[in-house]
Regions:
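Regulatory N- and C-terminal appendages and interdomain linkers associated
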Residues: 1-12, 20, 40-45, 312-376
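ATP-dependent phospho-/nucleotidyl transfer catalytic cores
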Residues: 88-111, 119-203
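Active-site acidic catalytic loop and adjacent metal/ATP-binding pocket
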Residues: 13-28, 32, 185-231
C-alpha cells in the first residue's frame, strides 16, 4: 500500500479579484489561501472576520502569515465548485427552473440580517462607520477624483456635443420625462453626503452574490464592521438588479470562469438602451430586464428585510433620502463611466438621473411591487 502524501497539495490559483486564491488540500482539511498584496487590507479583513464570526456564519480563519510583499490568510474552504456554492449560482437558475431553493435561501439570509441589524443598530458618527465603499471614494483623492477630475465625458458618438457638463443647462429626457441633472453639482454633493450620522449595524459591508455562500455563509471581510444600513441596502439591491447579472460579468468575465452559467444569463439581465439628441437635449429610452431568479431575490430582500428596517429606522419617506447618496455612489463610483461603452454609460446615466430626481422612488427605480417596498 502506498503511503498517503504527507505534504499539502496546492491547486491552481483562482482569480476572482486582484487577490489570488489558492486551494490547498491536506490529509485532514480543505483550505483556501488568500494572498493579499496590501497589508492594511489584510489587517482589516482579519479584524472584520473576528467581528463577524460572533454574528454570522463564516468559514474558520486558520492561519495568518505575513511575508515580504504579501499577507496570506488561510481559511476553511467551503464547497464552492463549478456553478455551485454561491448565491450567484442560485440566481443563475433559468426562468423555467425551480426557484424554491433560492426562496428558502433568501428567507434565511434576510432573517439573519434582520436579527443582527436589530441587535446591533445604532445612530453612528461617520468616523465609526466603514468608509471604503462610500465615504473614502468621495474624499479628495478618492475614486470620484480619480475617475472624473479631468473628464468631461461625451454622451454621443460625436465628440463635439452633448457632454456631461452640458446637462446642467439642458437636462435630459429619460423615457419621455425631462430630468434636471447637474453633473458637477452631483459630484460636489456626494463629497459631503457621507459626513453626517447614520443608522449603522454590524455587517460584512459588501453583500454581493459572490460574497454570499451556499449553504449560507458570508465571505470577504475587508469592509466588515459597522456599516451604514442604507449603504448595505443600496449595495445588495443595485448589485442584484444591475451589476451582478450584466455589467460585472460583461466587463470582468475572468472572475466568473468557475461559474459559466453566469454568461448564459447575461442576455436575460441586459437592459435595452437607445438615445438621440434633439434640439440640443439628449433623449434616452431604456427598458430594464431581469431574470425571474434575480427579481425574486430582490423582491424577497425588500419585503422581508428592507420593509421592517424602514419602518423602524427610516419612517415615512426617510429611506428614499437615506438611500440616495449610497445608490448614486454605486452607480458612478464602481466603474469609471469614461471606460464604458456608450450604451453602458448612458444606462448608468439614466439611473443616476432617476436617483437624483426630487421624487426618487425605490419602488419605481427597482421595479418593485408596492408590497415589497415601504416607500412611495
Amino acid at each position: 500500500m502506498r503511503p498517503s502524501n504527507p505534504f499539502p497539495r496546492i491547486g491552481a490559483p483562482l482569480k476572482f479579484s486582484r487577490n489570488r486564491l489558492y486551494p490547498i488540500d491536506t490529509r485532514r482539511r480543505r483550505l483556501i489561501a488568500k494572498c493579499m498584496t496590501d497589508h492594511n487590507e489584510a489587517r482589516a479583513e482579519v479584524l472584520g472576520h473576528q467581528l463577524l464570526r460572533d454574528w454570522y456564519p463564516v468559514p474558520t480563519l486558520h492561519h495568518r502569515v505575513r511575508i515580504p510583499g504579501r499577507t496570506v490568510l488561510i481559511y476553511e474552504r467551503l464547497p464552492v465548485d463549478t456553478d455551485r456554492g454561491l448565491l450567484l449560482d442560485l440566481l443563475n437558475t433559468t426562468d423555467d427552473g425551480d426557484h424554491s431553493t433560492l426562496d428558502a435561501y433568501m428567507r434565511r439570509m434576510t432573517s439573519t440580517y434582520l436579527h443582527v441589524f436589530t441587535e446591533t443598530a445604532e445612530l453612528s458618527p461617520p468616523s465609526t462607520v466603514v468608509g471604503k465603499l462610500y465615504r473614502d471614494r468621495a474624499l479628495p483623492g478618492g475614486r470620484l477624483d480619480h475617475y472624473y477630475a479631468h473628464n468631461d465625458i461625451p454622451l454621443t458618438q460625436a465628440q463635439d456635443r452633448p457632454r456631461l457638463s452640458d446637462l446642467a443647462r439642458t437636462g435630459l429626457y429619460v423615457n419621455g420625462r425631462h430630468h434636471q441633472l447637474d453633473w458637477d453639482g452631483t459630484l460636489s454633493w456626494l463629497r459631503g453626503a457621507f459626513d453626517t450620522p447614520v443608522w449603522s449595524a454590524i455587517s460584512q459591508g459588501d453583500p454581493t452574490d459572490v460574497n454570499l455562500a451556499v449553504p449560507l455563509a458570508w465571505l470577504d471581510y475587508d469592509t466588515a464592521g459597522r456599516n451604514a444600513i442604507a449603504g448595505e441596502i443600496a449595495n445588495f439591491s443595485f448589485y442584484t438588479a444591475v451589476l451582478g447579472g450584466w455589467l460585472v460579468p460583461t466587463l470582468n468575465p475572468q472572475a466568473f470562469i468557475q461559474h459559466p452559467a453566469t454568461f448564459d444569463q447575461i442576455p436575460a439581465n441586459t437592459p435595452r438602451v437607445s438615445a438621440h439628441p434633439h434640439a440640443g437635449t439628449l433623449h434616452i429610452r431604456f427598458t430594464d430586464r431581469l431574470s425571474q431568479a434575480r427579481r425574486l431575490a430582490l423582491s424577497r430582500y425588500w419585503a422581508l428585510l428592507v420593509s421592517p428596517l424602514a419602518a423602524r429606522y427610516f419612517p415615512g419617506g426617510a429611506l428614499s433620502e437615506a438611500l440616495r447618496p449610497y445608490l448614486a455612489m454605486r452607480i458612478i463610483g464602481v466603474f469609471d463611466l469614461v471606460r464604458l461603452s456608450l450604451e453602458q454609460r448612458l444606462y448608468l446615466l439614466t439611473k443616476l438621473a432617476l436617483c437624483m430626481a426630487p421624487d426618487f422612488s425605490p419602488t419605481r427605480f427597482f421595479d418593485l411591487t408596492e408590497s415589497s417596498c415601504p416607500t412611495r
